[in-house]
């Protein structure tokens, strides 16, 4: 077995951008800067105060296989939100018009396009003093300045290794579709612990107590409002907890993967792997999988993921209330026209009757009311050991598949499903169990989010 330091040396070589890649990125950055400057000159609006380059490119922590360049158009802070968004969108669409730009949405719209497979984001922000934030993007130029002043070349290499590791295990990125660790968070982790090995050692040994990570002494007045499993204080904004975007599942996966790497160092942890299931595990869960597939109308990926996740939570709750007990669920979309919900249920069919426990026998009126409501159905009554009146109730739905089909075909506006998802479902949907057909690549990808089946982390014994 290789020593972990040997593996990290290999990973560093793997992550280091080649000179041709750096030259390509620098050329594109200059090209886009010129295009934005030209658009700003053409628009000639004195509310536009400047332009800055940000993100991993500006900080020197980008990955060759996943690079983007962020441009922040600085707007006068006196501009209202509607005009702020209009100005940012106008500049972005104008500057990137030759590259089929499109709108993306975070806290406000921004423009994205791809040039030679490099993702370009043009984002409006207010030109404000530190701490006087008016939009979520206002912090970004300060993040760039902070990291360029504090990260040395050695630490930049360590950041790349950490990014590559997180990307390999599927938890890199703070967007809703991932719920993982952002590039900025990886930079903070390396600044705090100085190396990749020290950072993952901390993670591998996390306990039940909330883990607090801060570069400066945290302000005690804000700590009570942070309730995530891991608290990561933004060094330029003590009121902001970067850990809030990290899901419990992503943190748990990070902990397991960190332990596995420390115990069995291998360069394989830094190489992306397709979501391939151990077929034995897949066969075990198939009978208890319940899948809903449907078409979606085109809208922002950030919006659709949020709608899907909220609707997934609502449907999982309904399945559990009805006795099928969804103890695992996930969703998937191609962000264009296809979406699916996947549920891992305890029961796919239920008995004809369920127990209905009534009031204590000493509560006279409640007991009489309970019996009167039930007796017309000719159901038996008895007194249990807790001296409560008990009867049985006939279930309307014995099949999880039929129950979900009926639920989605009816009025679901009052169960918490997003209204846009309801409209999508109205055009048609398909409900099936995992054993009823061959699972497509989207469903397999969804299952890789739901079930830990990465052979580097869960090492199943071969027969």
Residue ranges and their predicted role:
Residues 334-463:
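Extended, charged low-complexity segments
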Residues 154, 159-336, 345-356:
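Conserved nucleotidyltransferase catalytic core and NTase-mimicking acidic/glycine-rich helix/loop elements
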Residues 14-22, 73-77, 294-301:
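Glycine- and acidic
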Residues 54-92, 119-131, 337-351:
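Catalytic metal-binding acidic patch
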Residues 1-64, 81-82, 110-112, 125-127, ...:
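N-terminal regions immediately upstream of nucleotidyltransferase
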Residues 114-170, 174, 194, 198:
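Internal, well-ordered alpha/beta segment that forms a basic, Gly-enriched binding/recognition surface
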């Amino acid at each position: 077995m290789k020593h972990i330091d040997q593996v990290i040396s290999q990973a560093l070589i793997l992550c280091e951008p080649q000179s041709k890649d750096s030259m390509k990125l620098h050329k594109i950055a200059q090209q886009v800067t010129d295009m934005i400057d030209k658009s700003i000159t053409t628009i000639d609006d004195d509310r536009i105060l400047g332009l800055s380059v940000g993100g991993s490119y500006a900080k020197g922590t980008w990955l060759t296989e996943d690079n983007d360049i962020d441009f922040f158009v600085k707007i006068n802070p006196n501009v209202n939100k509607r005009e702020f968004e209009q100005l940012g969108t106008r500049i972005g669409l104008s500057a990137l018009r030759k590259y089929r730009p499109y709108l993306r949405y975070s806290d406000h719209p921004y423009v994205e396009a791809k040039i030679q497979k490099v993702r370009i984001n043009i984002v409006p922000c207010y030109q404000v003093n530190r701490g006087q934030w008016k939009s979520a993007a206002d912090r970004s130029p300060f993040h760039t300045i902070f990291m360029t002043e504090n990260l040395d070349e050695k630490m930049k290499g360590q950041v790349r290794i950490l990014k590559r590791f997180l990307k390999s295990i599927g938890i890199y990125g703070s967007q809703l579709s991932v719920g993982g660790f952002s590039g900025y968070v990886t930079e903070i982790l390396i600044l705090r612990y100085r190396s990749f090995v020290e950072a993952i050692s901390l993670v591998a040994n996390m306990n039940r107590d909330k883990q607090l990570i801060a570069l400066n002494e945290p302000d005690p007045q804000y700590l009570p409002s942070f309730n995530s499993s891991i608290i990561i204080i933004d060094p330029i904004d003590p009121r902001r907890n970067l850990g809030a975007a990290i899901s419990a599942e992503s943190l748990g996966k990070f902990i397991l993967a960190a332990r596995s790497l420390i115990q069995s160092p291998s360069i394989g942890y830094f190489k992306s792997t397709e979501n391939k299931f151990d077929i034995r595990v897949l066969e075990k869960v198939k009978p208890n999988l319940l899948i809903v597939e449907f078409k979606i109308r085109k809208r922002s990926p950030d919006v659709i993921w949020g709608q899907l996740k909220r609707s997934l939570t609502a449907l999982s709750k309904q399945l559990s209330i009805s006795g099928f007990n969804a103890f695992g669920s996930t969703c998937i979309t191609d962000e264009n026209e296809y979406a699916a919900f996947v549920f891992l249920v305890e029961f796919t069919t239920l008995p004809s009757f369920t127990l209905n426990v009534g009031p204590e026998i000493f509560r006279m009126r409640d007991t009489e009311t309970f019996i009167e409501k039930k007796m017309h159905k000719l159901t038996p009554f008895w007194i249990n050991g807790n001296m409560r009146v008990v009867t049985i109730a006939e279930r309307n739905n014995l099949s999880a598949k039929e129950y979900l089909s009926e639920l989605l075909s009816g009025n679901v506006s009052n169960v918490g499903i997003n209204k846009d998802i309801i409209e999508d479902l109205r055009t048609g949907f398909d409900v099936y169990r995992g054993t009823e057909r061959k699972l497509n690549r989207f469903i397999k990808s969804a299952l890789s989010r739901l079930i830990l089946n990465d052979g580097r982390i869960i090492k199943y014994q071969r027969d």
